[in-house]
Amino acid sequence: MSITRRDLCLFFPAAFFPAFMRPESLVPQEGSMPSATYPFEKMPIRTPNNAQIRDVLKGKLATGESLEVHETTLPPGGAPHAAHHHVHSEMWLIREGTVELTVNGTSSRLGPGSVGFVHSNDEHGIKNVGTTPATYFVVAVGPGASS
């Protein structure tokens, strides 16, 4: 029986893949965030454009991705900034109120419990379209998320 290059190309990845995927081989990257808790009352608050933003965490995951999480409260009619785009992806978790999330020109209304997601480099914007304050969490992952 002869072994061809094709056989070797198929054999070696299959043979060694399990060794590379063992949990002990996934060593956290230097400078990654440690496991922690983030009490609400200790979160710093910023107030750009009449929004109240609580910075929850910023840093690098053990797997290398940048991560940033904050909570925003918008007054009725408020928006944190104009529509924009960036390299990292974002997810919104709506807690209270009604927001309108616009992604690449398509708008959707989201209420409590709803989730919105925007892929890297998609243009997006969010505003409070309700009559009460709207509160939501933003989870940003990818290059530039923690800057």
Predicted features by range, described:
Residues 120-145:
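Ligand-binding loop in jelly-roll beta-barrel domains
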Residues 4, 10-66, 146-147:
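A short, N-terminal "cap"/entry segment at the start of jelly-roll beta-barrel domains
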Residues 53-55, 69-73, 91, 115-117:
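Conserved hydrophobic/aromatic beta-strand scaffold that supports enzyme active sites
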Residues 79-81, 100, 116, 120-125:
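Histidine-centered metal-chelating micro-motifs
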Residues 70-85:
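Conserved short histidine dyad/triad with adjacent acidic residue
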Residues 106-119:
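Short acidic-glycine-tyrosine-enriched beta hairpin
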Residues 87-89, 94-99:
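Glycine- and acidic-residue-biased ligand/ion/polar-headgroup-sensing regions
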